[in-house]
């Protein structure tokens, strides 16, 4: 029975996290996997090639060897492990699960800040720091989505929690009170 993408990501992501923890390299692995994820997303053909059943293991290994230079021995071992089990088609999902485990272990939140206009990095960081402090997180990594329909303010979606401080939401509340 084939594993689902989610189950594959969970199993391999957990195994990689445990391996990194046992070797005392969780931060290094996090950093390198994050870098690798960005590279793979910028060049998705990399995963497609290493997942291609037409290429034999030796060809895939030589391609991987060329790419893994500059990464730690631990990450190289992980990449070779994934290659040997033919799991490169799940690479981004596996990395995402590792990041999820790392963030949970280190009390780091992730979320989205929806704003009407794009904030500068400093504004976004101040918002993240404020939220992290209020909710007991060590850090918060926020992505920004611009949504002109919220008119102004910000809608924060963090770890399943939504805080709607948008002008649109406030106007809807006023409208609801007036129509009662």
UniProtKB/Swiss-Prot annotation:
Pfam families registered for this protein in UniProt: OSCP
Protein name from the UniProt record: ATP synthase subunit delta
Organism taxonomic ancestry: Bacteria, Bacillati, Bacillota, Bacilli, Lactobacillales
Main location: membrane
Assembly mode: F-type ATPases have 2 components, F(1) - the catalytic core - and F(0) - the membrane proton channel. F(1) has five subunits: alpha(3), beta(3), gamma(1), delta(1), epsilon(1). F(0) has three main subunits: a(1), b(2) and c(10-14). The alpha and beta chains form an alternating ring which encloses part of the gamma chain. F(1) is attached to F(0) by a central stalk formed by the gamma and epsilon chains, while a peripheral stalk is formed by the delta and b chains.
GO cellular component: plasma membrane; proton-transporting ATP synthase complex
PANTHER family (alphabetical): ATP SYNTHASE DELTA CHAIN (PTHR11910)
Entry keyword Membrane: yes
InterPro entries cross-referenced by the UniProt entry: ATP_synth_OSCP/delta_N_sf (IPR026015), ATPase_OSCP/d_CS (IPR020781), ATPase_OSCP/dsu (IPR000711)
Bilayer disposition of the protein: Peripheral membrane protein
Keywords: ATP synthesis, Cell membrane, CF(1), Hydrogen ion transport, Ion transport, Membrane, Transport
NCBIfam families cross-referenced by the UniProt entry: ATP_synt_delta
GO molecular function terms noted in the UniProt entry: proton-transporting ATP synthase activity, rotational mechanism
Domain of life from the UniProt record: Bacteria
Family: Belongs to the ATPase delta chain family.
Location in the cell: Cell membrane
Species name: Lactobacillus delbrueckii subsp. bulgaricus (strain ATCC BAA-365 / Lb-18)
General function of this protein: F(1)F(0) ATP synthase produces ATP from ADP in the presence of a proton or sodium gradient. F-type ATPases consist of two structural domains, F(1) containing the extramembraneous catalytic core and F(0) containing the membrane proton channel, linked together by a central stalk and a peripheral stalk. During catalysis, ATP synthesis in the catalytic domain of F(1) is coupled via a rotary mechanism of the central stalk subunits to proton translocation. This protein is part of the stalk that links CF(0) to CF(1). It either transmits conformational changes from CF(0) to CF(1) or is implicated in proton conduction.
């Amino acid at each position: 029975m084939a594993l689902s993408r989610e189950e594959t990501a969970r199993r391999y992501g957990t195994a990689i996290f445990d391996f990194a923890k046992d070797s005392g390299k969780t931060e290094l692995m996090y950093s390198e996997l994050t870098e690798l994820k960005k590279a793979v997303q910028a060049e998705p053909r990399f995963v497609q090639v290493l997942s291609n059943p037409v290429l034999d293991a030796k060809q895939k290994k030589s391609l991987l060897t060329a790419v893994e230079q500059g990464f730690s021995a631990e990450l190289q071992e992980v990449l070779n492990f994934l290659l040997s089990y033919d799991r490169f088609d799940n690479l981004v999902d596996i990395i995402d699960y590792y990041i999820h485990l790392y963030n949970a272990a280190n009390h780091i939140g992730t979320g989205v800040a929806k704003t009407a206009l794009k904030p500068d990095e400093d504004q976004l960081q101040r918002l993240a720091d404020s939220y992290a402090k209020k909710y007991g997180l060590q850090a918060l990594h926020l992505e920004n989505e611009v949504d002109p329909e919220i008119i102004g303010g910000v809608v924060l979606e963090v770890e399943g929690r939504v805080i709607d401080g948008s002008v649109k939401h406030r106007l809807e509340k006023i409208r609801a009170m007036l129509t009662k």
